[in-house]
Amino acid sequence: MRLKGTIQTLLLSGVIVAVGASCSSQVPNTLTDAEKAEGWELLFDGQTLNGWRDFNGTALTEPWTVVDGCIQAKGAGSDGTGYIVTDKQYENFELSWDWKLTKGGNSGMLYHVVEGRQYQVPYVTGPEYQLIDEPNFPDKLEDWQKLGVDYAMHLPDQAKMKVNPYGQWNNSKIVFDNGHVEHWLNGQKVLEFEAWTDDWFERKNSGKWENAPEYGLATKGLFCLQDHGDPASFRNIKVKKLPRKTREVTLFNGKDLSNWVAYGTELWYVEDGLLICESGPDKGYGYLATREYYDDYDLSVEFKQEADGNSGVFIRSTVGRGVRVNGWQVEVAPPNHDTGGIYESYGRNWLIQIPDEKENILKYGDWNTLRIRVQGDNVKTYLNGEQMVDFTDEKIGKGIGRIALQIHDGGGIKVYWRNLKLTTL
């Protein structure tokens, strides 16, 4: 699914299970008592498409139906259409499903898919377990396009690949456990890797996803099936949630900007162990964002303002074209301008400002400690040990993305940062 060039170049992506043979008359979509006790849940009840809808939609209009206890694609979709997603998001999980391909069929299963107007197709955010009938596929396949791959990223162990031919059922499984990923095929583990490592980012940024900046970064998202132009059948789709693990993260190493991504032409550099942001000649907006997404966390940063000092810390944010940020800013501003308040850029503007009597907590020109606790739909901010706001918002609760530091436009800004650390919750 090479993102360079036209959408025709993406036709080999096999983005979802294009399974075409007619389904068995058996209705196997049930859970054993043991599976129920272990926490498994069905994503398909064997009779309806309840729990599924169009990608970026509110209802189900794409070419899907239920036939003989199976979800079946009608074969009317394409690379850019025909996607359906689960209503619910999943973070850490074990996902198992049965699939069956027609001759030459090409498809896959996606996870951690993110919706939004900026995402026209699911595969620019969600990784894919590739499903394809290799022996009968009409075009030459590269290794990264073959059955069982983490599409265009990681290859399976071919010695462990035991697949039933087209027209027969196979079983696949994806395990995503706090960044540890496994692909299984018919009871054999064929692939495993760690997400968000240096190696992972090197593969992402130098390969097929170099023009998809948000690919694979989401820590939670939707499961997705696609009608890729061939009839497709699925059954026994079930998932078990796995627990989130707490970890301590040092965001800034005091030496360089490793693990950060700069946006815009403003200046970001390291000097004497400090991270410094400074207005550049363009006097525009600038952002320095973590390369990873962070969902729920307790973040602590220290900052010292020089000159104007108008900056901020964005939570669950992405930065798009034209250095346009999507997300929420915890304000870092000059005196009497609501440091610690929460502002939504390009949206609702101020969501909550700090009480006037707390404006004197900021030590302008000296070091300050800003703490931000983000959990679900709630954000709490603290400045120098004093709580500034406690805010709950449904939209924030649905957000995902990076942590980002801001330089405001207008020029004349210089802010020093140090001790940027967080604990995931």
Regions found by a protein language model. Give the residues of each.
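Bacterial N-terminal signal peptides that target proteins for export
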Residues: M1-L11
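Carbohydrate-interacting regions of secretory-pathway proteins
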Residues: C23-L425
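Bacterial N-terminal signal peptides
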Residues: L10-G20
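Short intrinsically disordered, low-complexity coil segments enriched in acidic
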Residues: R2-L3, A18, S22
